């Protein structure tokens, strides 16, 4: 309280504006943390990274024969380009998950005829998931029903970076492959396929739009 006859002193800058500046700093900090949290979330439709359990799994030098209990990480065989018909060492899994490939990949789609491994490996490099099937090895479902289910699944996922293709040399009914990852089973399991797509699609070493 200022008594009569006293000169009233003007408040200093910090005394006058200090509380306002403090509140502003808190608001800016909160906004920054919120934006950082949003940036760390995957965008809608974007594939999430493989689980840490699979990443920590030792890479297998030889591919699984017969059904697996889940995705198996394979040893990387490189990404060398070769010419059509050019010889190369054998792939370490059936179907392959990395290695020698042609310069031109296949378009996404549901195919009625097999596609050369050397073409499909290029798709894997671009982050594709390839669903291979062999009707002779299927259990619990007919071939026509499987094809219809896979076509519907392809359309459900809008066909982005997915190829469905028959593979007569496959030793199981269905095989899922992505770059360095393989999963094989005999009975159609849509949730298993969708989980594989969610985890491993668009995880190849070359990032492309299609």
PLM regions: where:
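Mid-length scaffold segments of soluble, non-membrane domains
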Residues: 109-157
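C-terminal region of N-terminal signal peptides and the immediate post-cleavage residues
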Residues: 32-51
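Helix-rich interaction surfaces within compact, conserved domain-sized segments
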Residues: 149-210
């Amino acid at each position: 309280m200022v008594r009569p006859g006293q000169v009233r002193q003007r408040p200093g800058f910090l005394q006058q504006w200090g509380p306002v500046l403090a509140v502003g700093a808190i608001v800016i900090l909160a906004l920054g943390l919120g934006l950082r949290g949003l940036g760390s979330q995957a965008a809608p439709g974007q594939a999430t990274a493989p689980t840490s359990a699979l990443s920590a799994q030792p890479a297998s030098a030889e591919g699984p024969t017969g059904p697996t209990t889940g995705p198996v990480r394979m040893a990387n065989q490189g990404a060398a380009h070769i010419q059509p018909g050019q010889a190369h060492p054998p792939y370490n899994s059936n179907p392959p998950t990395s290695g020698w490939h042609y310069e031109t990949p296949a378009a996404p789609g549901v195919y009625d005829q097999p596609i050369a491994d050397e073409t499909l490996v290029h798709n894997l490099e671009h982050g594709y998931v390839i669903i291979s099937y062999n009707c002779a090895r299927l259990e619990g479902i007919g071939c026509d029903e499987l094809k219809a289910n896979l076509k519907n699944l392809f359309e459900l996922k809008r066909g982005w970076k997915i190829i469905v293709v028959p593979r007569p040399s496959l030793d199981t009914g269905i095989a899922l492959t992505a770059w360095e990852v393989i999963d094989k089973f005999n009975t159609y399991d849509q949730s298993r396929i969708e989980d594989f797509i969610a985890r491993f699609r668009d995880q190849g070493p070359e990032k492309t739009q299609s």
